[in-house]
């Protein structure tokens, strides 16, 4: 009787958790290495798997949205992240947001309960031999990062991610805010803080002159647009925030029946509804400055901060030079990478890459050929993008319809067109799963 093969998975974030889950459920043994809690990163607070260190939102759910399509694909692939997200969802209008603590706890418990997963709480300092999935994320420890750099023979690439502050609901002045989702989509899920032009001017001036926290030695000023600090956005011009997180369109104040000059939105952060985060307010301001400046927002004058915003480094590889669409390295086929390190950007994007990498690592362990997911699925399109775009100008990429093949028929309405792309993707993923991915253990 042949022995059961084993795959190493390094890192138990979103990508590593998905990789371990899928490998184990394909009948392959997993050694899952996670250095927390013995060694923490600058952004993590717990030892839980799949800890959400930025927002608690997994973004839109609708099939007309690229993030909605990706989540639908993940559900078809039996994603542990999506299972936990749906069990621990909190109100968020048309989006899917979660109670971050119970979400991570369920994923940790589910993976820990698998009989063929061995969890090893120690830091890995060099790339191990054997079939391995590296999913150490944007905050990879320095020793392993050096090993990866030496393997790839390239310089590090890094940029900033920033996390928004979290507030207590009972400290918000509810007389000054109102409950509403933009354009009244879904349930009324956001607390909205309306601003007059005069209030906005005071806030804007305070924000652009606020003192930022000192960056760590390993950080520089690169900023990825998807998680831009609010103070950096403000410095790009007075109007910039009004087209971003302070956009008032579709958020008429029920007291006046009119659209405010600006609106700051608060989104529920926990299942109990006791905590809210300030939407789009990722920041690197000093904590005292956050208290001073954000208390200028109507309704937040006396707010209690349970966690101030923080900023941390993100690291990613030049995947077009290094990886194949199976997430294998070109020079060592038994070494896979997954997660934000590959250049997919975002929670669900990272988790989805873990599904693909984990599936292919398990296939390799079982003596099967790794497979490329169809490019007309979002998972396949992302894998294709990060391995086929220009290496010299490579930047992280969120899920979006622009990286997917166009429809054969022309549909003028954008929402209808995107929905049709999504329906095609889900149909093709079903066929691919049934005809290509089925493994008889």
From Swiss-Prot:
Check the record and name the PROSITE patterns matching this protein: GIDA_2
What GO molecular function annotations does the UniProt record carry, in alphabetical order? Answer: flavin adenine dinucleotide binding; tRNA (uracil(54)-C5)-methyltransferase activity, 5,10-methylenetetrahydrofolate-dependent
What is its subcellular localisation? Cytoplasm
UniProt keywords (A-Z) are: Cytoplasm, FAD, Flavoprotein, Methyltransferase, NAD, NADP, Transferase, tRNA processing
Q: Does the keyword Transferase apply?
A: yes
- GO cellular component terms given for this protein: cytosol
Q: Which reaction does it catalyse?
A: uridine(54) in tRNA + (6R)-5,10-methylene-5,6,7,8-tetrahydrofolate + NADH + H(+) = 5-methyluridine(54) in tRNA + (6S)-5,6,7,8-tetrahydrofolate + NAD(+); uridine(54) in tRNA + (6R)-5,10-methylene-5,6,7,8-tetrahydrofolate + NADPH + H(+) = 5-methyluridine(54) in tRNA + (6S)-5,6,7,8-tetrahydrofolate + NADP(+)
- Main subcellular localisation: cytoplasm
The UniProt function text for this chain reads: Catalyzes the folate-dependent formation of 5-methyl-uridine at position 54 (M-5-U54) in all tRNAs.
Query: Which named protein is this?
Result: Methylenetetrahydrofolate--tRNA-(uracil-5-)-methyltransferase TrmFO
Lineage of this protein's species?
A: Bacteria, Bacillati, Bacillota, Bacilli, Lactobacillales
């Amino acid at each position: 009787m042949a022995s059961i093969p084993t795959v190493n998975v390094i890192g138990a974030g979103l990508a590593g958790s998905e990789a371990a889950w899928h490998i184990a459920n394909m009948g392959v043994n997993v050694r899952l290495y996670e250095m927390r809690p013995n060694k923490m990163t600058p952004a993590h607070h717990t030892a839980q798997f799949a800890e959400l260190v930025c927002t608690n939102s997994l973004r839109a759910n609708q099939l007309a949205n690229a993030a909605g399509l990706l989540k639908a694909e993940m559900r078809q692939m039996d994603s542990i992240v999506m299972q936990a997200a749906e069990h621990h969802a909190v109100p968020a209008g048309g989006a899917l947001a979660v109670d971050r603590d119970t979400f991570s706890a369920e994923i940790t418990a589910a993976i820990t309960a698998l009989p063929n997963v061995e969890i090893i709480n120690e830091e890995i300092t060099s790339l191990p031999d054997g079939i391995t999935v590296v999913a150490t994320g944007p905050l990879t420890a320095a020793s392993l990062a050096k090993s990866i750099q030496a393997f790839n023979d390239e310089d590090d690439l890094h940029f900033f991610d920033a996390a928004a502050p979290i507030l207590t609901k009972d400290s918000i002045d509810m007389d000054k805010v109102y409950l509403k989702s933009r354009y009244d989509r879904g349930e009324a899920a956001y607390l909205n803080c309306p601003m007059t032009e005069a209030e906005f001017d005071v806030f804007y001036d305070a924000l652009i002159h606020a003192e930022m926290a000192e960056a760590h030695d390993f950080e520089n000023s690169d900023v990825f647009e998807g998680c831009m600090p609010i103070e950096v956005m403000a410095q790009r011009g007075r109007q910039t925030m009004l087209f971003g997180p302070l956009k008032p369109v579709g958020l008429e104040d029920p007291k006046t029946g009119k659209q405010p000059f600006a609106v700051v939105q608060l989104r529920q952060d926990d299942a109990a509804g006791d905590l809210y985060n300030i939407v789009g307010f990722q920041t690197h301001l000093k904590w005292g400055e956050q208290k001073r400046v954000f208390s200028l927002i109507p309704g937040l004058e006396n707010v209690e901060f349970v966690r101030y915003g923080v900023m941390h480094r993100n690291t990613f590889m030049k995947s077009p030079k290094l990886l194949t669409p199976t997430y294998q390295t070109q020079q060592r086929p038994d070494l896979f990478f997954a997660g934000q390190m590959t250049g997919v950007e975002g929670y669900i994007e990272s988790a989805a890459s873990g599904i693909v990498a984990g599936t292919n690592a398990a296939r390799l362990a079982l003596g099967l050929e790794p497979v490329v997911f169809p490019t007309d699925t979002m998972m396949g399109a992302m894998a294709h993008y990060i391995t086929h775009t220009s290496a010299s100008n490579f930047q992280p990429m969120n899920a979006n319809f622009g990286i997917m093949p166009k429809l054969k028929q022309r549909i003028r309405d954008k929402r209808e067109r995107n929905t049709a792309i999504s329906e095609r993707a889900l149909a093709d993923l079903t066929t691919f799963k049934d005809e290509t991915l089925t493994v008889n253990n």
